[in-house]
């Protein structure tokens, strides 16, 4: 069993989604290769089971998400403006640090995101990647009520983009080559 270091928590994994990024990492077909050996999985949900030195939150027993962004420096121009995803020192879960396709994972406590008990682990897991990706797009586009939004490709991310756009009150146009996906 892994042991959490300073600033880390040990998470007992309840659910881990499979993303195409995990498949690319396993096949090694991206220009940036994962750190070997590695455990893939960046769509993990679990409960904090142990605390490393200096960690008081999240508390033991807290249900948390492990996302693609496993850690960032916290002090560069990107991090201090809330754009940690652009940090040049970021470490990605299941790629640069071991991921959630295991019974336990060690996670940077700053990036272990509490998950409400009202959301099942099955529902929460894909939100840590596809959900965050599509939410970020809707947010970056500054979609407002009554605006028209076209979503191209109604697959794993597209169906979430439709839901987020509707939640902000947009009129959504779904576009796909598959008639089945448009139903």
What are these model-predicted stretches?
Residues 64, 117-183:
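Mid-domain Rossmann-like dinucleotide-binding core that forms the NAD(H)/NADP(H) cofactor-binding site
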